[in-house]
């Protein structure tokens, strides 16, 4: 899929934010708080890589927190922009799949995500419970958009001691960027109490444009072209070599195919980019628009009677 196509939700959101609408509008400002997990080469369960949540280790879920601003465009569409901090991590030591256990790599990544997404209403009830009091409303929505992501993977030697920045160590002799794009998509809901306090929940999947969230992607490279520390972090099979049930150490580390002359030992899976999942609770405070249209149409809900313009009688 071309990047120009993936930018369409972002451009559409900007267009809608700047479009004047003849209806009630509302801003709300709030926070996210929840967890994040990732899908990539690292860790996993007892099989080779599988898509989506089936290959995630729930015990590796870590903090996700952020803030956002949302504008309601109309009853079916809102635009949400926010900044989130989240941590994802993984370790081959935690998997029951032999080839990954033998690789024995690990990482953690503290990431910052700046996103813009469009939220599409699936279902809405403006008078939850149907009592005519209009004190609580409910909205179920789906969303999609675009995000800019800053990430910085770090790793340990055998999951002990200091964490080292992996990108400058070039463990696969690749100069990848700290910045990338992601495509967020998900579903959520919120309750609005007394038109001011909005409590919600959402879950979202992010597909990224990089395979280096975990610093693992292709094959083992020549350690002589790395620093001593980079070479140690690139291949950590030596810490588990000889453990019964794991593949032979010859399956790990730099080796050249005698026919093609290319590295032959697989370190990662370059056919799939890394992804991550967030699940957060949200709270926001609603600011209502005060246009003449809004006052005339909705004052009856607040108990304010509409009063027509009076004129003096003429005799």
Language model features: what each stretch is:
Residues 36-40, 82, 86-90, 123, ...:
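Structural signature of outer-membrane beta-barrel domains
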Residues 25, 59-63, 110-114, 138, ...:
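Residues that define the transmembrane beta-barrel architecture of outer-membrane proteins
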Residues 194-315:
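Predominantly the C-terminal beta-signal and adjacent terminal strand-loop region
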Residues 31-35, 67-71, 116-120, 144-148, ...:
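Residues on the lipid-exposed face of transmembrane beta-strands in outer-membrane beta-barrel proteins
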Residues 39, 76-79, 125-126, 195-199, ...:
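Repeated loop/turn-to-beta-strand initiation elements of outer-membrane beta-barrel proteins
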Residues 75-77, 83-159:
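Gram-negative (and chloroplast) outer-membrane scaffold detector with strong preference
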Residues 36-64, 68:
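Surface-exposed strand-loop-strand hairpins of Gram-negative outer-membrane beta-barrel proteins
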Residues 50-55, 99-107, 129-130, 168-175, ...:
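Extracellular loop and loop/strand-boundary signature of outer-membrane beta-barrel proteins
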